[in-house]
Protein backbone atom coordinates (compact mmCIF):
# COMPACT_ATOMS: atom_id res chain seq x y z
CA UNK A 1 0.00 0.00 0.00
CA UNK A 2 1.71 3.17 -1.17
CA UNK A 3 5.45 3.13 -0.64
CA UNK A 4 5.27 1.70 2.85
CA UNK A 5 2.69 -1.01 3.51
CA UNK A 6 4.06 -1.51 7.03
CA UNK A 7 3.39 2.10 8.02
CA UNK A 8 -0.12 1.91 6.61
CA UNK A 9 -0.86 -1.30 8.51
CA UNK A 10 0.42 0.22 11.76
CA UNK A 11 -1.72 3.31 11.20
CA UNK A 12 -4.85 1.25 10.53
CA UNK A 13 -4.27 -1.10 13.47
CA UNK A 14 -3.44 1.77 15.82
CA UNK A 15 -6.45 3.80 14.73
CA UNK A 16 -8.86 0.89 15.16
CA UNK A 17 -7.45 0.05 18.59
CA UNK A 18 -7.65 3.66 19.78
CA UNK A 19 -11.15 4.26 18.48
CA UNK A 20 -12.35 0.94 19.90
CA UNK A 21 -11.14 2.00 23.34
CA UNK A 22 -13.03 5.31 23.06
CA UNK A 23 -16.14 3.48 21.88
CA UNK A 24 -16.07 0.89 24.66
CA UNK A 25 -15.58 3.49 27.40
CA UNK A 26 -18.35 5.66 25.96
CA UNK A 27 -20.79 2.78 25.61
CA UNK A 28 -19.87 1.59 29.09
CA UNK A 29 -20.72 4.98 30.58
CA UNK A 30 -24.00 5.27 28.68
CA UNK A 31 -24.95 1.75 29.74
CA UNK A 32 -24.10 2.50 33.38
CA UNK A 33 -26.08 5.74 33.38
CA UNK A 34 -29.39 4.52 32.00
CA UNK A 35 -30.86 8.04 32.09
CA UNK A 36 -28.01 9.40 29.96
CA UNK A 37 -28.68 9.52 26.23
CA UNK A 38 -26.44 10.69 23.41
CA UNK A 39 -28.44 12.78 20.89
CA UNK A 40 -28.32 10.96 17.55
CA UNK A 41 -30.33 12.38 14.68
CA UNK A 42 -29.61 13.57 11.17
CA UNK A 43 -28.90 17.32 11.13
CA UNK A 44 -31.74 19.33 9.58
CA UNK A 45 -31.49 22.09 7.00
CA UNK A 46 -31.05 24.71 9.67
CA UNK A 47 -27.85 22.94 10.72
CA UNK A 48 -26.20 23.25 7.28
CA UNK A 49 -24.77 26.76 7.88
CA UNK A 50 -23.27 25.57 11.17
CA UNK A 51 -21.76 22.53 9.45
CA UNK A 52 -20.24 24.65 6.71
CA UNK A 53 -19.05 27.20 9.24
CA UNK A 54 -17.53 24.52 11.45
CA UNK A 55 -15.63 23.00 8.54
CA UNK A 56 -14.48 26.45 7.47
CA UNK A 57 -13.19 27.24 10.95
CA UNK A 58 -11.47 23.86 11.07
CA UNK A 59 -9.62 24.40 7.79
CA UNK A 60 -8.71 27.96 8.81
CA UNK A 61 -7.30 26.65 12.09
CA UNK A 62 -5.32 23.97 10.25
CA UNK A 63 -3.93 26.56 7.81
CA UNK A 64 -2.86 28.88 10.62
CA UNK A 65 -1.33 25.89 12.41
CA UNK A 66 0.75 25.01 9.35
CA UNK A 67 1.90 28.60 8.93
CA UNK A 68 2.90 28.89 12.58
CA UNK A 69 4.59 25.47 12.44
CA UNK A 70 6.81 26.70 9.61
CA UNK A 71 7.76 29.61 11.85
CA UNK A 72 8.27 27.66 15.08
CA UNK A 73 10.00 24.40 14.09
CA UNK A 74 13.10 25.90 12.40
CA UNK A 75 13.88 27.81 15.60
CA UNK A 76 13.80 24.83 17.98
CA UNK A 77 15.77 21.62 18.34
CA UNK A 78 13.69 18.45 18.07
CA UNK A 79 14.73 15.27 19.86
CA UNK A 80 15.33 12.08 17.83
CA UNK A 81 12.51 10.39 19.77
CA UNK A 82 10.03 13.10 18.83
CA UNK A 83 11.07 13.01 15.17
CA UNK A 84 10.69 9.23 15.10
CA UNK A 85 7.23 9.50 16.68
CA UNK A 86 6.00 12.11 14.19
CA UNK A 87 7.13 9.94 11.28
CA UNK A 88 5.70 6.72 12.74
CA UNK A 89 2.92 5.00 10.82
CA UNK A 90 2.44 7.82 8.34
CA UNK A 91 0.30 6.36 5.53
CA UNK A 92 1.27 7.03 1.93
CA UNK A 93 -0.31 6.48 -1.48
CA UNK A 94 -3.36 4.24 -1.29
CA UNK A 95 -2.84 4.28 2.47
CA UNK A 96 -3.96 7.91 2.49
CA UNK A 97 -7.23 6.90 0.83
CA UNK A 98 -7.72 4.15 3.42
CA UNK A 99 -7.02 6.70 6.17
CA UNK A 100 -9.63 9.02 4.66
CA UNK A 101 -12.23 6.24 4.63
CA UNK A 102 -11.38 5.38 8.25
CA UNK A 103 -11.82 9.03 9.17
CA UNK A 104 -15.32 9.14 7.73
CA UNK A 105 -16.47 5.71 8.91
CA UNK A 106 -14.69 5.34 12.25
CA UNK A 107 -12.49 8.15 13.58
CA UNK A 108 -14.95 11.03 13.19
CA UNK A 109 -18.05 9.21 14.47
CA UNK A 110 -16.37 7.44 17.40
CA UNK A 111 -14.36 10.41 18.67
CA UNK A 112 -17.34 12.74 18.48
CA UNK A 113 -19.54 10.18 20.22
CA UNK A 114 -17.00 9.98 23.05
CA UNK A 115 -15.69 13.55 23.39
CA UNK A 116 -18.85 15.47 22.51
CA UNK A 117 -21.73 13.02 22.91
CA UNK A 118 -20.54 11.66 26.24
CA UNK A 119 -17.95 13.96 27.85
CA UNK A 120 -19.22 17.36 26.70
CA UNK A 121 -22.87 16.48 27.20
CA UNK A 122 -22.15 15.21 30.72
CA UNK A 123 -20.32 18.44 31.54
CA UNK A 124 -23.14 20.46 29.99
CA UNK A 125 -25.55 19.03 32.54
CA UNK A 126 -23.60 20.81 35.31
CA UNK A 127 -21.85 23.74 33.66
CA UNK A 128 -22.33 26.44 31.05
CA UNK A 129 -21.93 25.73 27.35
CA UNK A 130 -18.57 27.53 27.24
CA UNK A 131 -17.19 25.57 30.17
CA UNK A 132 -18.42 22.26 28.77
CA UNK A 133 -17.07 22.97 25.28
CA UNK A 134 -13.73 24.25 26.59
CA UNK A 135 -13.19 21.40 29.04
CA UNK A 136 -14.14 18.72 26.52
CA UNK A 137 -11.81 20.41 24.04
CA UNK A 138 -8.94 20.23 26.52
CA UNK A 139 -9.62 16.53 27.14
CA UNK A 140 -9.69 16.01 23.36
CA UNK A 141 -6.30 17.74 23.10
CA UNK A 142 -4.85 15.71 25.97
CA UNK A 143 -5.64 12.40 24.28
CA UNK A 144 -4.19 13.61 20.98
CA UNK A 145 -1.01 14.90 22.62
CA UNK A 146 -0.14 11.65 24.37
CA UNK A 147 2.70 10.54 24.44
CA UNK A 148 4.37 13.64 22.95
CA UNK A 149 5.35 15.22 26.33
CA UNK A 150 7.40 12.10 27.16
CA UNK A 151 9.53 12.45 24.01
CA UNK A 152 11.40 15.56 25.19
CA UNK A 153 9.93 18.01 22.66
CA UNK A 154 10.47 21.76 23.13
CA UNK A 155 7.81 23.51 25.20
CA UNK A 156 6.91 25.57 22.13
CA UNK A 157 6.00 22.41 20.21
CA UNK A 158 3.85 21.05 23.04
CA UNK A 159 2.09 24.40 23.44
CA UNK A 160 1.53 24.65 19.70
CA UNK A 161 0.00 21.16 19.48
CA UNK A 162 -2.09 21.68 22.62
CA UNK A 163 -3.51 24.93 21.26
CA UNK A 164 -4.27 23.39 17.87
CA UNK A 165 -6.12 20.35 19.22
CA UNK A 166 -7.94 22.42 21.85
CA UNK A 167 -9.19 24.78 19.14
CA UNK A 168 -10.29 21.89 16.93
CA UNK A 169 -12.05 20.31 19.90
CA UNK A 170 -13.72 23.64 20.61
CA UNK A 171 -14.94 23.92 17.02
CA UNK A 172 -16.45 20.44 17.08
CA UNK A 173 -17.89 21.18 20.52
CA UNK A 174 -19.52 24.37 19.28
CA UNK A 175 -21.01 22.42 16.38
CA UNK A 176 -22.44 19.83 18.78
CA UNK A 177 -23.94 22.53 21.00
CA UNK A 178 -25.35 24.40 18.01
CA UNK A 179 -26.99 21.42 16.27
CA UNK A 180 -27.95 19.27 19.25
CA UNK A 181 -26.65 16.05 17.68
CA UNK A 182 -23.24 14.39 17.68
CA UNK A 183 -23.82 13.44 14.03
CA UNK A 184 -22.96 17.01 12.96
CA UNK A 185 -19.47 17.18 14.53
CA UNK A 186 -18.90 13.54 13.54
CA UNK A 187 -19.52 14.46 9.92
CA UNK A 188 -17.38 17.60 10.12
CA UNK A 189 -14.57 15.76 11.90
CA UNK A 190 -14.61 12.91 9.40
CA UNK A 191 -14.70 15.18 6.35
CA UNK A 192 -11.95 17.41 7.77
CA UNK A 193 -9.62 14.48 8.44
CA UNK A 194 -10.42 12.89 5.09
CA UNK A 195 -9.54 16.08 3.20
CA UNK A 196 -6.30 16.43 5.16
CA UNK A 197 -5.35 12.84 4.33
CA UNK A 198 -6.09 12.94 0.59
CA UNK A 199 -4.73 16.45 -0.01
CA UNK A 200 -1.12 15.19 -0.47
CA UNK A 201 -2.31 13.02 -3.38
CA UNK A 202 -3.06 16.19 -5.36
CA UNK A 203 0.19 18.03 -4.66
Residue ranges and their predicted role:
Residues 1-14, 74-77, 149-157, 200-203:
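Juxtamembrane/transmembrane-helix boundary motifs at the membrane-water interface
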Residues 1-34, 87-90:
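Alpha-helical transmembrane segments in multi-pass membrane proteins
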Residues 2-9, 37-108:
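Juxtamembrane helix-loop-helix connectors linking adjacent transmembrane helices
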Residues 18-22, 57, 61-65, 168, ...:
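Alpha-helical transmembrane segments of multipass membrane proteins
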Residues 21-26, 63, 67, 109, ...:
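Proline-rich low-complexity regions
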Residues 24-32, 63, 146, 174, ...:
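Residue-level signal for alpha-helical transmembrane segments in multi-pass membrane proteins
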Residues 27-46, 171-174, 179:
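Cytoplasmic juxtamembrane interface segments
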Residues 93-203:
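Transmembrane helix-loop-helix hairpins at the membrane interface
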